[in-house]
Amino acid sequence: MPEINEIRNYALFISDKLKNKEIIDIKILNGRYKHKGPFEHYETLKKDLPIKLLDVKTKGKLLYMILEDNYYILSTLGLSGGWCYLKAGKKEEKDNFDFSKNMDYYQGHVADDKMDSYIKNSINHLNVEFKTSKGSLFYYDTLSFGTIKVIKGIDELNKKLKTLGPDIMDIGTDLVVFKTQIKKPKNLEKEIGIVLMDQKTISGIGNYLRSDILYLSKINPFRKVNKLSDAEIKIIFDNCKLLTWGEFDKKEAKRLKILNKNSKLPEDYDRLFFVYNQDTDIHGNKVIKKELYEGSQKRFIYYVKEIQAY
């Protein structure tokens, strides 16, 4: 379930390992692309190897690698996808793999046995390898809900990026932009808990962020957008920025005046989340779990009735 702050950490991780290095081979090892056929333009890209990785960027929950010769690799992580790295000559053993900053954060809040199981399971599902002379970057995905796609040409990239709403962490996504997107006519009769997850409206917010954002905002997730005041929308916006930037880069969040001495994050209460997948909140109130989603993929919202009155 990686969300925008984690996607940005993966982008930094991949950039650190592969930027300005040549990819000399790509192998499909496991997962959906092994069993159902390779991702689009896989064979074409392989024929053009070696090829240098120039940069790694993100928009919302989409990560994309910029290569030479106008190639782009697009990555979505689904529920269980991620990236890890193994130096050349090292055996594929748990302690030899490098993981992103995300793993450090999880290890501080998840039991050791669960983390150990997660890492082992990830290594057992290395689905795609991008090899350089210095080592290999692996895409892992235990459930194979994530995707990899190769496209060619800046026009194709821009076409994809235009399908996504403004990135919630982007500096240009200010309150005016946020409010305009949230209050589009198509959203007015929808629950705010659904609208926040619509990647065409605002990109980057997923299931756990929406629960915690609305909890901090003291807004019931089933409230319709047309029933929210401008003041309430501002509170939601502020907490979107706080939870995404606060988890990603505290120093930068302080510089941007998103995080201040009064700001609180889940880690301040020794928790991974405020209410997502929790039995009680930080005050001991019962957390309610209910279905709230659009489309075919079932999603649950977590909220506290005493704090988030309808």
Language-model features, listed with the residues they occupy:
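N-terminal functional module of multi-domain proteins
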Residues: 39-42, 49-96
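Generic recognition of long tandem-repeat/solenoid scaffolds
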Residues: 63-67, 128-130, 302-304
